[in-house]
């Protein structure tokens, strides 16, 4: 497997892999600095949309991935999301992805957030998966933490195999195929 360059990412985006797409790096908006997004040397920095689900413990339930209670989250829409101390929030990317059959995509958090104790987690985007990426932001600090909508939050790395997979995510009817918006756990 080899990592794909900015040139490859631009060509793949022209074929519909990433929508909307930014061909370069955006570092400013409205005259001020932002957390960067867009194409980098060997990756693509995605933006966080303005839809959030903030984890709350008001119902004092047990977190069970097989029977997840939607009431464990408070829905929020806005330019800035405040994550409570030692808690987390779900969000989604602005970008919609269509991953080629020969590609596996790995997501890593941006250092701007990591250096503040905010960790971004996303599982790999498998071959022929498509949808908005659901992002998990963990606030590992004892203080409230801000996430900025419309700005960079994570970087996607594209790895292309020297052999096309026998069965893709689409072929096996993956449960998150075509997801839109913030998607909760499914079994």
Swiss-Prot record:
HAMAP family: dCTP_deaminase
Catalytic activity line of the entry: dCTP + H2O + H(+) = dUTP + NH4(+)
Active-site residues, record numbering mapped to chain: 136 (proton donor/acceptor)
UniProt GO molecular function: dCTP deaminase activity; nucleotide binding
Pathway stated in the Swiss-Prot or TrEMBL entry: Pyrimidine metabolism; dUMP biosynthesis; dUMP from dCTP (dUTP route): step 1/2
Family: Belongs to the dCTP deaminase family.
EC number(s) stated in the UniProt entry for this protein: 3.5.4.13
PANTHER family registered for this protein in UniProt: DCTP DEAMINASE (PTHR42680:SF3)
Binding residue positions for dCTP: 110-115, 134-136, 155, 169, 179
Keyword Hydrolase: yes
InterPro entries xrefs: dCTP_deaminase, dUTPase-like_sf, dUTPase_trimeric
Pfam families attached to this UniProt entry: DCD
Name of the protein in question: dCTP deaminase
Function field: Catalyzes the deamination of dCTP to dUTP.
């Amino acid at each position: 497997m080899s990592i794909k360059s900015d040139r490859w990412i631009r060509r793949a985006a022209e074929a519909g892999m990433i929508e909307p797409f930014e061909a370069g790096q955006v570092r400013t908006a409205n005259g001020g600095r932002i957390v960067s997004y867009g194409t980098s040397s060997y990756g693509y920095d995605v933006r966080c949309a303005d839809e959030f689900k903030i984890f709350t413990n008001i119902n004092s339930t047990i977190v069970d991935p097989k029977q997840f209670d939607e009431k464990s989250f408070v829905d929020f829409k806005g330019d800035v999301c405040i994550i409570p101390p030692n808690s987390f929030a779900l969000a989604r990317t602005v970008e919609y992805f269509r991953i080629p059959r020969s590609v596996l995509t790995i997501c890593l958090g941006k250092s701007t957030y990591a250096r503040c104790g905010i960790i971004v987690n996303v599982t790999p985007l498998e071959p022929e998966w498509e949808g908005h990426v659901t992002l998990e932001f963990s606030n590992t600090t004892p203080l409230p933490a801000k996430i900025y909508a419309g700005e960079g939050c994570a970087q996607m790395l594209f790895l292309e195999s020297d052999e096309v997979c026998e069965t893709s995510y689409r072929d096996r009817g993956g449960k998150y195929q075509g997801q839109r918006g913030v998607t909760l756990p499914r079994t």
